[in-house]
Amino acid sequence: MKKKFMLLALIVLGSVSAFAEETPVLELKQTVVTSDSFGTSVRETTKNMTVVNAKEIKEKGAKTIADALRGVPGVVVREMDGSSPTIDLRGSGATAQFNTVILLDGIPVSGLAGFNLNSVPVEEISKIEVLQGAGAVMYGDGAIGGVVNIITKAPTNKTVYGGAGLEVGSWRTIRENVHLGGKVGDKLLLNASYSGSTSKDYRDRSPQYENKKDKTDSLWLRGKYLLDNGSIAINYNHSEDKDYYTGYLEKKQFDKNPRQVGSWSGYTYGINDIVNAKYNQKINDKIDIFLTAGYYHNKNKFQNNSTSEYFIRPEVKYTYAKDSYVTLGLDYRDGKREFKEDVLVNSVSQKAPDDKRESFAGYITNK
């Protein structure tokens, strides 16, 4: 009897072994974390990082960054008509917008005036990195909850390429995008793209806005120059976003007609200009340098104020052993928001004081 059981066990083990030999190994593509300036794979990073790539965004059918982030563990997206979506990391609640740093290609844009996530078309996104928890403290004040880093598509090393797209949907929605890029000589890569959309809401509009449409336009110009052991990249983005909204409904009103106009209506109109530049160079086997700089300007035409912010971050990486290195870096930010009109304070009209913020920090990390 024992011999029969032993023979059966050998046959089963042999079959499992043969199956294992025949089954091909699926090797997943490595994901590199770009919030680390010098690049670290997700497997190697010790941070609580989630990456949503362009393929996943497309498979979700996401039309906005808010759509793309829904379903990410630990992330809550709140939206209110007429305002930018708020990303809540780690249950920050009402203070979420002050506890989450938004980066666009590594440049902080959620400063004095905040940043409208809907101004970045999903067609322009390569991936979105979400960093939650204490690992985000190196990104400065306002990162208690975490960091959302939006990485846009870089110029491709091809002679000539391009494409265009058009979508039509409910409520007179039209989305269009077009891009064109190419290589000039052996080292210069260029890319230009445009994305736009117009739409009317599910909700009805008040008479003065009845024939108006929500409208977004976004133009991107990108250039990258390849060095022998590094590169220089410059990106420019101009975007305009106009959104019409109406107020809330009481329950009786909603039950009767959920599409009807609320007790008030209004609109927001924002214009953004963003420039960022990156330089990286490998000096030798032990030393790498990296420089990130950016400028962000926002003009709110509805509230009649404007915001300007500057940012620069130089970093040096010293590799002292295999897979071990020290990174030394500095952060400098300078921002100002100016109000063009008086505001009401305790029922008294007065000139609003301008907001100013300047910060400087240094850091050193060891891996």
Q: Where do the PLM segments sit?
A:
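N-terminal Sec signal peptide and the immediately downstream disordered periplasmic leader
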Residues: 1-60, 66-72, 181-182, 217-219, ...
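Transmembrane beta-strand segments of Gram-negative outer membrane beta-barrel proteins
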Residues: 29-30, 127, 146, 152-168, ...
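Sequence/structural signature of outer-membrane beta-barrel proteins
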Residues: 38, 169-173, 198-206, 241-243, ...
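Extracytoplasmic beta-strand/coil segments of soluble accessory domains associated
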Residues: 66-107
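Short acidic/polar hinge/loop motifs at secondary-structure boundaries
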Residues: 107-133
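Residues that define the transmembrane beta-barrel architecture of outer-membrane proteins
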Residues: 144, 167, 172-176, 215-219, ...
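Face-selective signature of the C-terminal outer-membrane beta-barrel domain
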Residues: 226-240, 267-367
